[in-house]
Amino acid sequence: MRTLLLVAIGLLFVFAANGQTAYVSKVKKWRADHQTELLSDSGWFTVAGLFWLQSGVNTIGTGPEYDIKLTKNFEQGKFGEIAFANGSALLTVANGVEATSGGKPISSINLIDDQKSDPTTIIVGSQSFFVIERDGRYAVRLKDTQNEPRLNFHGLKWYPIMPKFRVTATYQAFAQPMEVLIPNVLGSTFKMKSRGILRFRMNGRPYSLMPVEEGDHLFIIFKDLTSKTETYGAGRFLYAPKPANGKVVLDFNKAENPPCAFTEFATCPLPPPQNRLNVSIPAGEKRYHD
């Protein structure tokens, strides 16, 4: 009888170890995929500029005299101009400049911003740009596949994967969706809707986070005490599956830096007051820049 008990206990340890190994492997793959996405031809490490559009003519080219400054990889000087008024942007390309959109050559085109369906992207050599809309303001976001931060990438930094930072939260739905004021790096706020609150325990103490919905996931913008020393100072992002039977798994081993951790040309949301936690969560992604 005792022998059987020892065998059973041994098997439990083996199963637990195998389960933990499988979990660590899954998180490692997720982290590798996350890095691949950041470094892709359209990833955040290619972002090379952000230029707010002014009413009237906005010139585009390489050099300090232009309103929208392409990188040095465009060697022809003047690229063209954007005539902007009341959210409408008309691009005219200078004579002799080759540019495409949707795989077709262009000389003039209306630029559809990123908040509408089928936004317009302009390609010129290794660079691309498109119009974004944020809080009623419009800007041109520039990307370059030969961007120096991408070419000089030196690896993401992570805490060791620890299963204890994968916690199960209780999801308490609101009677009605609640509007949450989300601040951003532009100094303004915008409204998002939250349908409930997540309650969980860490180190024996209760905490809560207010998520918003993004596609098929919950999106959590949070900040913890590690932001003072080891993680990005403005906070981090965490995605989680939508609740099942009133429960949500929060895997802080997958906590990730916002785009602003890698480029000054992003327009990141910041944690609302409800999501600033008075606890250290040494899990997930660390600061990219020391």
Description of each model-found segment:
Residues 1-4:
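Positively charged n-region of N-terminal signal peptides that target proteins for export
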Residues 6-14:
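Bacterial N-terminal signal peptides
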Residues 17-21:
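Boundary at the C-terminal end of the N-terminal hydrophobic targeting segment
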Residues 22, 26-74, 225-226:
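N-terminal beta-hairpin/loop module of FHA
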Residues 53-117, 239:
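Forkhead-associated
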Residues 123-189:
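Surface-exposed beta-loop interaction hotspot
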Residues 165-227, 232:
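Flexible, glycine-rich surface segments
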Residues 229-253, 257-260, 272:
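C-terminal soluble interaction/assembly domains
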